[in-house]
UniProtKB/Swiss-Prot annotation:
<dbReference type="InterPro" id="IPR040442">
    <property type="entry name" value="Pyrv_kinase-like_dom_sf"/>
</dbReference>
<keyword id="KW-0547">Nucleotide-binding</keyword>
<feature type="binding site">
    <location>
        <position position="237"/>
    </location>
    <ligand>
        <name>substrate</name>
    </ligand>
</feature>
<feature type="binding site">
    <location>
        <position position="68"/>
    </location>
    <ligand>
        <name>K(+)</name>
    </ligand>
</feature>
<dbReference type="InterPro" id="IPR001697">
    <property type="entry name" value="Pyr_Knase"/>
</dbReference>
<dbReference type="InterPro" id="IPR015793">
    <property type="entry name" value="Pyrv_Knase_brl"/>
</dbReference>
<feature type="binding site">
    <location>
        <position position="36"/>
    </location>
    <ligand>
        <name>K(+)</name>
    </ligand>
</feature>
<dbReference type="GO" id="GO:0005524">
    <property type="term" value="F:ATP binding"/>
</dbReference>
<dbReference type="GO" id="GO:0030955">
    <property type="term" value="F:potassium ion binding"/>
</dbReference>
<feature type="binding site">
    <location>
        <position position="34"/>
    </location>
    <ligand>
        <name>substrate</name>
    </ligand>
</feature>
<feature type="binding site">
    <location>
        <position position="238"/>
    </location>
    <ligand>
        <name>Mg(2+)</name>
    </ligand>
</feature>
<dbReference type="InterPro" id="IPR036918">
    <property type="entry name" value="Pyrv_Knase_C_sf"/>
</dbReference>
<keyword id="KW-0460">Magnesium</keyword>
<dbReference type="GO" id="GO:0004743">
    <property type="term" value="F:pyruvate kinase activity"/>
</dbReference>
<comment type="subunit">
    <text>Homotetramer.</text>
</comment>
<keyword id="KW-0324">Glycolysis</keyword>
<comment type="similarity">
    <text>Belongs to the pyruvate kinase family.</text>
</comment>
Length: 428
């Protein structure tokens, strides 16, 4: 029985913040725990970080903690934080000032906003048309009915609202995260190399930076962003709103092609198993979405609301893992049929003891279809390669005898359990 190589990123939220539930997610297949700093207090995030660190100690592998920055996204505040039901044709007012009757949107520059501009709420769930712009706010006509909830995101496609990839709150969040042992940063709304370099100056050289592509500018500067990042996330929610949903398919393919060409890992995110937020099985289209992401070469697939607030978080991870396993099995059979298999066809695992980054990258780029167990005392190695497909980072002191090292760390049966005693390995 082969191990699933594709990594699963889970957003931790109210449904999954306890130590017990995090342990269940890890056992189900979670490789990276994502903390979305657009929601929740730092105190709440600190408790989750502690719970993750306690829960991952018995996993036998490094489960990473990712801090997802707020970025320049606009978050609305409804009066008294209550949900607002809206109908098509209705006119709403948005205010830059806190108000008891208007929807509050702090920190937005309205100079570039004009009449007939489109505005979207909650990844496009609600579409609005600007009908009036004033000094302290603006009015919009609602184009489709729905529910507006407090703290949901707003998008202003094609409009400069004075945003920056890294605001003061983000800097404070990152400093807090570094102090408390986060493993990587997911940087929101990265639009150019300078955005990544600014974050690098904050985190130093030992924390990987994954750039989220979710704007037209990010798409335009994709290659330079990929070159200076440790990985790239296809953040399909905001990106779909920014570029138009009808263009999302080709954008996803282009991001994958450009980023993989530079040898960087890719995370596919947003609504991958969305229906499982409320029910215990995915839609057929979601199965195809996850499976095709694996076939296209994604290193990680990500859950957001499904694992943060969903009714079936653990079941969702298990189902996603099964879909990834099926896609990987199909991919390997296809490659065998085409005669494209290499050394991984004849071994059950590759073991790298105290290897260098270049050694690990070289083996990763050969696209083996078996686990690559990287045993290292370097926290940077463990962090960086935790988002690479097929690489299992394990903390430990390696030795020349890979078999002895695996047995000493209790890993041989756990990661190379293929139903035989004669496990075939290649050690590097």
């Amino acid at each position: 029985m082969r191990m699933v190589l594709t990594k699963i990123v889970c957003t931790i939220g109210p449904r999954t913040s306890s130590r017990e539930k995090i342990k269940e997610l890890i056992d189900a297949g979670m490789s990276i725990a994502r903390l979305n700093f657009s929601h929740g207090s730092r105190e709440a995030h600190l408790e989750v970080i502690r719970n993750i660190r306690d829960s991952r100690s018995g996993a036998g592998r490094h489960v990473s903690i990712a801090l997802d920055t707020r970025g320049p996204e606009v978050r609305l505040r409804t009066p008294e934080m209550k949900d607002i039901k809206v109908e098509g044709g209705e006119v709403l007012r948005f205010s830059l000032l806190s108000s008891e009757k208007d929807i509050w949107i702090p920190g937005v520059d309205l100079k570039s906003l004009g009449v007939d501009n489109r505005v979207f709420i909650d990844d496009g769930a609600i579409e609005l048309r600007v009908v009036n712009v004033e000094e302290d706010g603006f009015e919009c006509e609602v184009l489709n009915s729905g529910m507006i909830k407090s703290n949901k995101s707003m998008n202003f496609p094609g409009t400069d609202i004075g945003d920056r990839a890294l605001g003061d709150e983000d800097k404070n969040d990152i400093a807090f995260g570094l102090e408390n042992g986060i493993d990587m940063v997911f940087a929101s709304f990265v639009s150019c190399r300078a955005d990544v370099e600014e974050i690098r100056r904050l985190v130093g050289s030992k924390v990987p930076v994954v750039s989220k592509i979710e704007s037209c500018l990010g798409m335009r500067n994709l290659k330079e962003i990929a070159l200076c990042s440790d990985g790239v996330m296809i953040a399909r929610g905001d990106l779909g709103v920014e570029i138009g949903l009808e263009n999302m398919f080709s954008a996803q393919k282009r991001i994958l092609y450009e980023v993989k060409r530079e040898g960087r890992p890719v995370i596919c995110a947003t609504q991958m198993m969305e229906s499982m937020t409320l029910k215990n099985a995915p839609n057929r289209s979601e199965i195809s979405d996850v499976g095709n992401a694996v076939l296209d070469g994604c290193d990680c697939v990500m859950l957001s609301a499904e694992s943060a607030v969903g009714m079936f978080p653990v079941e969702t991870v298990k189902f996603m893992r099964s879909i990834c396993a099926d896609a990987e099995r199909y991919d390997m059979e296809s490659r065998k049929g085409a005669g494209a298999c290499g050394v991984s066809s004849y071994v059950d695992g590759v073991v790298i003891c105290s290897g260098t980054e270049s050694q690990i990258e070289k083996i990763y780029l050969s696209k083996p279809e078996t686990p690559i167990i990287v045993i290292s005392e370097s926290l940077w190695i463990l962090r960086r390669f935790s988002i690479y497909r097929g690489i299992i980072p394990v903390y430990g002191k390696g030795s020349e005898d890979a078999e002895a090292t695996l047995r000493r760390l209790g890993l041989r049966g756990r990661f190379l359990a293929v139903g035989r005693e004669d496990v075939r390995m290649v050690s590097v």
